[in-house]
């Protein structure tokens, strides 16, 4: 199937099979389609709604072109990454969580990029902290094995995406590439907590990752619109564990945490975000600390360092109050520039 045939099919609201989608996406990722064709295809998919098989196929193709990072011990390997696009301008919660999980004994292969729709992307705030973003795959692997955290800057690992960059900028809408970003971790992490920008993606993404062989996954979207576990409202969850998917709703009060005001954790830039991250990692009582505890607790749970979400959040709070998570940030800055 070529892209013209695919467009004709999706405008009829007909899903593509995995094989059909892989053929079309391979052509896009190798520069064999025009910008007009790629644009029409992406818009058509977005209007139709991307199916589980279509998303799975795109992830497979992107992974096949990815510059991979090899991690020897994957038992507690995890990523904390979201689709972004919630438009709320909050600080980099999932980035802060990475240091808490590392302090808990996890191995965090953090996948991220500069801010596109947000005030601060994970790459922006890490650069503000002094982290070297231009590490080779070997150095990233060493950092993960030595201190429990490494950062994989998306443009370095996904060169083939370049064929879609201009089209996506011109379209200025969410496309399938926004959905698959967190699913294309270069270290092939078996465990993840993933935030998505709409509730409609929560359960489908869990099914995609089941098809792709993931081990333990939590996908979240909150009632108040976050691609994180919210400190201010209910959060919808799909959990993949032992090959089975279950859905449920959680609230901060389930974990003994008070509801917080999201206005307290909004930022204007990466420097603002870094301040909130440092305060949370120092254990300063705040909305920032509590939302980091919720999300890092989920990550601690999915990478098998806690037996339940409740235990994971409890461990995260103890780590935050001890200040050792901030030490992990300092260690990472040092190792990224010299390891």
From Swiss-Prot:
Its EC number is 2.4.2.18. Mg(2+) 2 binds at residues 227-228. Anthranilate 2 binds at residue 168. Keywords: Amino-acid biosynthesis, Aromatic amino acid biosynthesis, Glycosyltransferase, Magnesium, Metal-binding, Transferase, Tryptophan biosynthesis. It comes from the Bacteria. One of its GO terms (cellular component) is cytosol. Anthranilate 1 binds at residues 82, 113. It catalyses: N-(5-phospho-beta-D-ribosyl)anthranilate + diphosphate = 5-phospho-alpha-D-ribose 1-diphosphate + anthranilate. Its cofactor is Mg(2+). Binds 2 magnesium ions per monomer. InterPro entries: Anthranilate_Pribosyl_Tfrase, Glycosyl_Trfase_fam3, Glycosyl_Trfase_fam3_N_dom, Glycosyl_Trfase_fam3_N_dom_sf, Nuc_phospho_transferase. One of its GO terms (molecular function) is anthranilate phosphoribosyltransferase activity. One of its GO terms (biological process) is L-tryptophan biosynthetic process. Pathway: Amino-acid biosynthesis; L-tryptophan biosynthesis; L-tryptophan from chorismate: step 2/5. Homodimer. Belongs to the anthranilate phosphoribosyltransferase family. Catalyzes the transfer of the phosphoribosyl group of 5-phosphorylribose-1-pyrophosphate (PRPP) to anthranilate to yield N-(5'-phosphoribosyl)-anthranilate (PRA). HAMAP family: TrpD. This is Anthranilate phosphoribosyltransferase. It comes from Vesicomyosocius okutanii subsp. Calyptogena okutanii (strain HA). The lineage of its organism: Bacteria, Pseudomonadati, Pseudomonadota, Gammaproteobacteria, Candidatus Pseudothioglobaceae. The gene is trpD.
